[in-house]
C-alpha cells in the first residue's frame, strides 16, 4: 500500500475515533480551557475555525427550521407587498416596520383595517423576515389561539402551552375581532399578553379599532387591560390602518 494511502487511512481512522465521543459529549468550557493552556498556535487556530464553523452551522439550521415552527399559513414576503394602501402613524415610518425595530423595545404593532386589505400578508412577511434573522416567531389566528389555550387548560397543560408561546420573541395574533371571544377565552388571551410584557412583541391584525375591542372580548375591562399592557406599559402602541383597495 502506498505511503499516501496508508496516511490517509490512518487519518480517517483517527477522525472516526474523534467523532464517536463528539456525538455524545456536550462541550465543557473548563475542559476546553484546560486543553488550550498547552495548545500550540496552530492548534488554537484550528479550534477557533472549528468553533466559528459550528456556530455558523447551528445558526443556518435554526434559520431554516424557524419558519416551519412558526405556523405560517402561507409564504408571504415583503418584496411583493403593495404599501400604497397603508396609512402609517405620523411619528413612524415604513422603515421602522420593515427593519423589525419594534422587536428591540419590545413594542406591539396593531394592523387595523377592513377584511381583505393585506394585513395578514404583511404580518406573515414580517414574521418570515424575523425567522430568517434567527428570531423565533409564532403565528396564530385569534380564534385558533383561544381554542388552543382552552383545550390545554381542560387537559391540565396550560402552563406547558404558555411556556411554548413564551419561547417566541414575536407573536402574531391574526384576525382579532372576526370571532367573538367568551369570558374564559378573554382571560386566557390576556394571560398571553401579560406574559409577553417587556419580553415579546405581539403583532395584532384586526378589523376593529382598539377602542372597540370590548365588543370582541365580551368584557370591556379585559379589553382595556390588554390595551393598557400594550399602549401604556410598553414604549409605543403602533396602530396603523389599511384602506380597502381593488388589489386585495
Language-model regions, residue ranges each:
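Charged, compositionally biased N-terminal leader segments and the immediate start
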Residues: 1-30
Amino acid at each position: 500500500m502506498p505511503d499516501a494511502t496508508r496516511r490517509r487511512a490512518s487519518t480517517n481512522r483517527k477522525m472516526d475515533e474523534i467523532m464517536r465521543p463528539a456525538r455524545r459529549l456536550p462541550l465543557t468550557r473548563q475542559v476546553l480551557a484546560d486543553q488550550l493552556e498547552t495548545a500550540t498556535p496552530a492548534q488554537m487556530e484550528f479550534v477557533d475555525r472549528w468553533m466559528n464553523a459550528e456556530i455558523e452551522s447551528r445558526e443556518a439550521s435554526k434559520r431554516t427550521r424557524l419558519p416551519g415552527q412558526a405556523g405560517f399559513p402561507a409564504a408571504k414576503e415583503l418584496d411583493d407587498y403593495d404599501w400604497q394602501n397603508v396609512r402609517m402613524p405620523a411619528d413612524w415610518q415604513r422603515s421602522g416596520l420593515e427593519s423589525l425595530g419594534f422587536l428591540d423595545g419590545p413594542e406591539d404593532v396593531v394592523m387595523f383595517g377592513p377584511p381583505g386589505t393585506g394585513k395578514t400578508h404583511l404580518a406573515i412577511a414580517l414574521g418570515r423576515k424575523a425567522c430568517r434573522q434567527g428570531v423565533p416567531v409564532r403565528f396564530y389566528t385569534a380564534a385558533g389561539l383561544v381554542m388552543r389555550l382552552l383545550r390545554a387548560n381542560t387537559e391540565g397543560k396550560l402552563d406547558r402551552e404558555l411556556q411554548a408561546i413564551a419561547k417566541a420573541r414575536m407573536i402574531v395574533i391574526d384576525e382579532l375581532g372576526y370571532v367573538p371571544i367568551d369570558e374564559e377565552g378573554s382571560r386566557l388571551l390576556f394571560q398571553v399578553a401579560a406574559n409577553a410584557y417587556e419580553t415579546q412583541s405581539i403583532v395584532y391584525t384586526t378589523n376593529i379599532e382598539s377602542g372597540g375591542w370590548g365588543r370582541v372580548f365580551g368584557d370591556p375591562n379585559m379589553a382595556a387591560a390588554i390595551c393598557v399592557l400594550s399602549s401604556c406599559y410598553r414604549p409605543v402602541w403602533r396602530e396603523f390602518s389599511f384602506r380597502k383597495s381593488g388589489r386585495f
